[in-house]
Regions:
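Membrane-helix boundary/helix-loop-helix interface segments in multi-pass membrane proteins
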Residues: 2-40, 46-197, 358-373
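Hydrophobic alpha-helical transmembrane segments
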Residues: 72-77, 307-327
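Transmembrane alpha-helix boundary/anchor motif
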Residues: 79, 87, 143, 242, ...
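Hydrophobic alpha-helical segments of polytopic membrane proteins
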Residues: 97-98, 104, 179-239
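Hydrophobic, glycine- and aromatic-enriched re-entrant/interface helices and adjoining loop segments
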Residues: 116, 120-122, 224-316, 335-339
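Alpha-helical transmembrane segments of multi-pass membrane proteins, especially transporters
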Residues: 134, 170-174, 178, 205, ...
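Hydrophobic alpha-helical segments of membrane proteins
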Residues: 195, 203, 279, 314-318, ...
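Loop-to-helix entry and N-terminal half of a specific, functionally important transmembrane alpha helix
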Residues: 331-369
């Protein structure tokens, strides 16, 4: 019995990526992904300038204020991406464990700062501001990937009730090693985000972790059942948020009645509707002239729809879909399961942010404060 058990474990716990070849740093697939990213970044700069030059001039005295900020952030992001490409994945696996405790301390420290609009989400040091939930998202991607990839993989094995030893192993691996242990570190993070409160951060972080587990087969059908149960519990969860004032205000403004909508959502729908098929033309938006709040960040997609119309909106959505699809292909070609899960997690964050932002702008879901990547 013990010999058969060892043979089963040796045979069934080896990870084999769905696509067997590592794409390498300069493969055609990686170059195509970087080209798509460059197109999205260039498109974003053009649209940000169009949406922000009036606001920048009137509020900051510089029509290029927001463009300068964005270019600086892009340069920092590209530098970090280039630096991370030289970091060995074994170092990331080691570093994600102590970094988890640092992230918890950062989230707790956020609660000590004065609230802004009823929420404590930022650490302010001098002129610098850091939203700790963004750091927490990346840390949870690394830690979830580490814990889930450390669990044994059981391949296509399906236990029989007569094989009690193998059934016990199957349940332990599927439930404890592949679901509970990877998800357990998420609980303290969610508790601290609730205390801020930061519900959009909770939704995104949970969705990212769930996507990693589902797309890599962790937990098998049990993970999909858990996701279905979470979807069924969504409405009771929305009922519970009535105790949180600002969340209830956002839910109250989410309505099919145009007169009941808040000014931000109403102006967003006006911008989308006035764009039509081809739009008013680049730079010709009316709503960006201080009519549409947050036209330079959360609601910039409305300006895209107004100036470039339905065609422009579809174009940017297709570009994001292409970026995510190429990223997933790179992830599935990674040399080990940890790298695959990290790649899936990063693409999941982009995908969920795009979905939530466009859904908010079109009044499909309540306002979450999630920006377009």
């Amino acid at each position: 019995m013990e010999a058969a058990r060892r043979q089963y474990r040796q045979k069934e716990t080896t990870w084999a990526p769905p696509l067997q070849r590592d794409p390498g740093p300069w493969s055609r697939l990686v170059i195509n992904w970087m080209a798509t990213l460059a197109v999205i970044m260039a498109f974003g700069l053009v649209m940000l300038y169009s949406a922000s030059y009036t606001t920048g001039y009137l509020r900051m005295g510089d029509s290029l204020h927001y463009i300068k900020q964005q270019i600086l952030c892009m340069a920092i992001g590209i530098g970090c991406m280039a630096a991370m490409s030289y970091v060995d994945h074994r170092f990331l696996r080691w570093a994600c464990k102590p970094c988890y405790w640092i992230v918890l301390l950062m989230l707790a420290a956020t609660l000590a700062f004065p609230p802004l609009n009823g929420c404590r989400r930022w650490i302010r040091l001098g002129g610098l501001t850091l939203q700790t939930s963004e750091v927490a998202k990346f840390e949870m991607i690394l830690l979830t990937a580490h814990l889930a990839s450390s669990a044994p993989q059981i391949g296509r094995f399906r236990p029989s009730l007569k094989e009690k030893v193998r059934l016990k192993d199957w349940l332990f691996i599927r439930i404890v090693r592949q679901i509970i242990l990877p998800v357990l570190p998420l609980v303290p993070v969610l508790v601290l985000l609730i205390m801020e409160p930061h519900m959009s951060g909770i939704l995104l972080t949970t969705a990212i972790v769930g996507t990693i587990l589902m797309l890599t087969g962790c937990g098998g059908v049990l993970t999909w059942c858990g996701a279905a149960a979470a979807a069924l519990l969504l409405k009771p969860a929305l009922t519970l948020v009535e105790s949180i004032g600002y969340l209830q205000d956002r839910l109250n403004t989410w309505s099919d009645d145009l007169e009941a909508l808040n000014d931000q959502t109403k102006q967003s729908l006006y911008a989308i509707g006035s764009g039509g098929l081809k739009g008013l033309g680049l730079g010709n938006s009316v709503e960006k002239q201080l009519w549409l709040p947050e036209s330079t960040n959360d609601f910039i997609f409305s300006v895209v729809c107004e100036e470039l119309g339905f065609i422009g909106a579809v174009l940017i959505i297709v570009l994001f879909i292409l970026l995510i699809a190429q990223g997933l292909m790179i992830a599935y070609k990674a040399e080990n399961q940890f790298c695959t899960m990290v790649g899936i997690g990063i693409m999941a964050q982009i995908a969920w942010q795009v979905f939530c932002n466009i859904a908010v702008v079109t009044n499909t879901i309540p306002n979450t404060g999630i920006s377009l990547p």
